[in-house]
Amino acid sequence: VARSCYMNCPKGAVHFDKKTGQARIDHDTCISCGICHKSCPYHAIVYIPVPCEEACPVKAISKDEHNIEHIDESKCIYCGKCLNACPFGAIFEISQVFDVLEDIRAGKQVIAIPAPSILGQFDASIEEVYGALKQIGFADVIEVAEGAMQTTSNEAHELLEKIAEGQKFMTTSCCPSYIELVNKHIPAMKPYVSTTGSPMYYASRIAKKKYPDAKVVFIGPCIAKRKEAQRDECVDYVMTFEEISSVIKGMRIDLKEVSPYKVAKESVCEAHGFAQAGGVAGGGE
């Protein structure tokens, strides 16, 4: 009788029970390579997927010799899919909520720069959401959409220049996860990525120019922005929509009862459309 699992195991982790003849896997020896699963013609060995490994689009997560999962930083693109997929909460992001609230409580000038997609996050008008941010203690609110207008203008000029040079297309530089993907996994795409800064990049500089000594807090939906902020000296903290929503609830702020706040400079609708599919390209047109 063929024993494919036994013959193909590189670590000799498969053995047979002398009484029953059933195959057993020694998990102290097994390295979870999957060779036995692939070689068994009877499908007697079942692969149990690990949610975080399955969710990772770049295969950056794997187990070590002790069966412990690790994230390979040289492959990770900080998309957050593993965080959402893990049913045990074993993967978590490092929050800066308490740092932000501590600075506000200490009387420091803290400026909020919310992403355009905040428009669809709350069941309230944008002025009411900004009013809630003011009630939390933010000294001012500057829309990232204002920075998006600069991104749109600069990317449009850059695209025209590259087309004139013979380049057929150009991709956006707005998404930090995409930038990590290109740098780590598709280096051949690097020449086609725009060198224009993201909306957060420009908005943070607008905030720092207006409030040189202030702490600038980017508020958005994406945890990859935390990585981008680490490389940007003008962004001090990053909060997700989930975190800002928790603060609003924790402080018992009713969005329908706050004093609406209107930003000093309103952004064009195209700048708010960056969050939609095709929004960046549409703005450039």
Label each residue range with its predicted role:
Residues 87, 92-285:
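Iron-sulfur-associated redox domains of electron-transfer enzymes in respiratory
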Residues 2-27, 35-77, 81-96:
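Iron-sulfur cluster-binding cysteine motifs and their immediate structural context
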